[in-house]
Amino acid sequence: GLYHQKYDYPPETILSHTFWEERPEEFYRFYRDKLIVKGAKPNAAHLRLAKLEREGRLKAVITQNIDGLHQAAGSKTVYELHGSTLRNYCVKCGAFYDVDFIANSTGVPRCPGCGGIIKPDVVLYEEGLDEQVLSGAVSAIRRADTLIIGGTSLVVYPAAGLIRYFRGDHLVVINMQPTNADAEADLCIAKPIGQVLSEDVVVEE
C-alpha cells in the first residue's frame, strides 16, 4: 500500500527499536513523514473528556495515541501507554526537545549540547511500556466504577489486557467494529467515539 510506495519496509519494521538503532536515517524520515501530525487540534471527543474531568465526573484518560491532543484539550490525568511525539530526549545527556525540533531537523536529529541522538518518547516495537504509566493506568481502572472503552478494537497488547483489572459496575464500549469486550459490556455503541461524545449524553450519577 501507501507505505511500500515510498519506503522499502513495512511500518512495523521501521518503527522498531532495532531499525531505529541500525537505520536511523530511514527511521527519522518515516517518523517525520508519518508520525508527526502538524496542526492537529483536539476534536469534540477530546474536549468532552476534558470537560467531564473538570466537572469531577471523569478521573483519568488512558490512551494509545501519541499526539498529545488530550492534554491540548485540557485533560490533566492522562496515561499515554505508547508515549508522545511531543516529548523527545537526548539518549546521551537526557536533554528535552519538543516536537518542532524533530520536525524541523534533517537526517538524524542530534543534541546541540552533546551530539547525542535525540529519541522520541514513543514506545517502539521491541520496547516495553513505561512501568509508571502502566501502573497508573491499572490503578485508575481498578478504582473506576465506570469504564468507557472508545475507539479501539482491543487487539494491541498489553493495552488490551488492562480491561481485566476493572472491577466496577458499568462497562461501556464505543467502537465502530466489534471488540473482545463486547460480551462483558453493559452497553455497546457502534458509532465513532467522536460522534458519541460530542452529543449531549446525560449521565446519571
Can you describe what each PLM-predicted range is?
Residues 1-205:
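Conserved catalytic core of sirtuin-type NAD+-dependent deacylases
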